[in-house]
Regions:
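GST-like domain detector, emphasizing the conserved glutathione-binding G-site
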Residues: 31-160, 262
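N-terminal secretory signal peptides and thylakoid transit peptides that target proteins
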Residues: 1-17
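C-terminal segment of N-terminal export signals and the immediately downstream linker at the start
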Residues: 3, 22-37
Length: 263
């Protein structure tokens, strides 16, 4: 009887472990982070929540990472349980507050717990660049990429749009990187963390021709060598990208945009 009860307890414990979300905790804690409330990152593999994991790894701040490995629906169910109105990744529990929007979360963590790291000083000439790219990443770049993706998946393009398109927004980044090593200016910053996701989307989904943007490619190569990003991938993307969108069969032809009617 006792043996059977022990066996049942062991099986129950194994079942609980199998069903539980994967939890990872940062191995290092930066001195002075004691005032930070507990941070739990609710994550979907290969999505924007990776930015917050990367940020915490760069800063050496403690966090818990919650997702169901290889199960996007299961991970989303965990997010929906704590954020039912706008379930999205990242959803971050910061003490007793629920936070969304990766850019806002990055700014909050850097302002309160970054100790001056990953962000130019207020009087730095690099601060305007940093702020532009922090917001350009989602406000212009990602927005245009996904808009073009939906349109081009429905009807593959024959000519470039007369409006700002995916090639134009990536070219803006390419031109900036011709004169600056990082999107925050002289040093790696939160702006670089913001920009990696949409620039990977641009090439992975065949929205642009990667060969046209050597400065972006060189920047990506530097980024991929960062130890904090490697740790992030080990923890937050252990099996590689899952559930990704299909690549476009073709993108708009490169070159000048078509003229606007009447111009």
């Amino acid at each position: 009887m006792k043996t059977e009860m022990t066996r049942r307890s062991s099986l129950a414990a194994m079942a609980a472990l199998t069903a539980a979300p994967l939890v990872a905790t940062a191995a290092t804690t930066r001195k002075g982070s004691d005032s930070m409330p507990p941070v739990t990152i609710y994550h979907l593999e290969g999505r924007r929540s990776e930015r917050i994991v990367w940020l915490m790894e760069e800063l050496g701040l403690p966090y818990e990472l919650r997702f169901k490995r290889g199960d996007l629906k299961g991970s989303m169910a965990s997010i929906r349980a704590i954020n039912p109105i706008v379930p999205m990744a990242p959803t971050v529990q910061y003490g007793d507050q629920i936070l969304v929007e990766s850019g806002a979360i990055i700014e909050l963590i850097l302002d309160r717990h970054g100790a001056g790291k990953l962000k130019p000083a207020l009087d730095s000439a690099d601060l305007p660049h940093y702020l532009i790219w922090m917001h350009f990443a989602e406000g212009s770049l990602a927005a245009r990429l996904f808009s073009d993706y939906r349109a081009w998946m429905a009807k593959p393009p024959e000519v470039r749009s007369p409006m700002v398109d995916s090639e134009a927004v990536v070219q803006f980044a390419e031109s900036f990187l011709a004169d600056h090593p990082w999107f925050g200016g002289a040093e790696f910053s939160g702006a670089d963390i913001m920009m990696l996701f949409p620039l990977n989307v641009a090439t992975a989904l065949n929205l642009v021709d990667e060969k046209q943007f050597p400065n972006v490619a060189a920047w990506k190569a530097k980024i991929e060598e960062r130890p904090a990003l490697k740790r992030t991938r080990e923890k937050a993307l252990p099996d590689g990208l899952i559930g990704s969108l299909p690549r476009l069969p073709r993108h708009a032809p490169s070159g000048p945009r078509a003229s606007l009617p009447g111009s």
